[in-house]
Amino acid sequence: MIIKNAKVFTDGCRFVEKDLMIRDGRIVFGATPQENEEVLDAKGSYALPGLVDIHFHGAVGHDFCDADEAGLQAIADFEASKGVLAICPATMTFSEEILNGIMDVAAAHKNEHGADLVGINMEGPYISPKKVGAQNPKYVMAANADMFRRLQARSGGLIKLVDVAPEEPGNMDFIKECHDEVRISIAHTCTDYDTAKEAFAAGATHMTHLYNAMPGITHRAPGPIIAALEEGAEVELITDNVHIHPAVVRFTFNTFGDDHVILIADS
């Protein structure tokens, strides 16, 4: 396929109108056109690779935690219609019993159309009761490796990210024990700089919605954000101009580098 007159993002950080081709499922430039090849006129529309959202909760009136296949399919279809072709929806802070139902639906999902369900982001319940945000404090608990493994088995191995507040009793041990089985993210936390550094040394590699639901930066208490920067962590940003000021978004890209920043919807 040839896509003509598309706005393409270039190395100069600008959109430039040009033609591109699809070969073996990949975008290429400068390939030789084939005889009778399908041609699509983008008419100045943007042409981008399919996006991946690793942290959102639902769409079009459906929540991933509803544990409903029809709702999950509606979410997947909507995400694909907006250019998000792979999704890793997030669970909320719930009991193991409720989480079991969510994992069952995810494991049974067929990915026949819409965005592919490529993982689950387990945002709770191993968080700080002092930084619950929109989570339900009733279900906050200490991180439990056995519980995580039961949920992982139930999901068919779909859990790719687990959020942990490392300062809570027992949670550092969870990081040490499970970091080889799943990616660990520091989140919904009151942790200080030293504890965050310890968590990264123990195996955490990620920070959930940087700046939100965590201590900020001061010159005498650098907190988890500076620890994440020093340790080269991957960090999420909610770039809706509400959760974070645009200047802070620019600051984060300039300090962490674009290869460490992950834009999320958290919708």
List each model region and its residues.
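Divalent metal-coordination and catalytic microenvironments
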Residues: 6, 25, 44, 55, ...
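Di-metal (Zn2+ and/or Mg2+/Mn2+) metal-binding site signature of metallo-dependent hydrolases
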Residues: 45-67
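Histidine-rich, glycine-flanked metal-binding segment
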Residues: 1-48
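Divalent metal-binding pocket/active-site signature
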Residues: 122, 129-145, 149-223
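Active-site glycine- and acidic-residue-rich loops that bind
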Residues: 95-101, 167-169, 185-189, 238-255
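Active-site-adjacent C-terminal substructures of enzyme catalytic domains
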Residues: 195-267
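Residue-level marker for buried hydrophobic side chains located in beta-strands
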Residues: 50-52, 185, 261-264
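Divalent metal-dependent hydrolysis catalytic cores, especially in the metallo-beta-lactamase
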Residues: 57, 73-101, 115-128, 155-167, ...
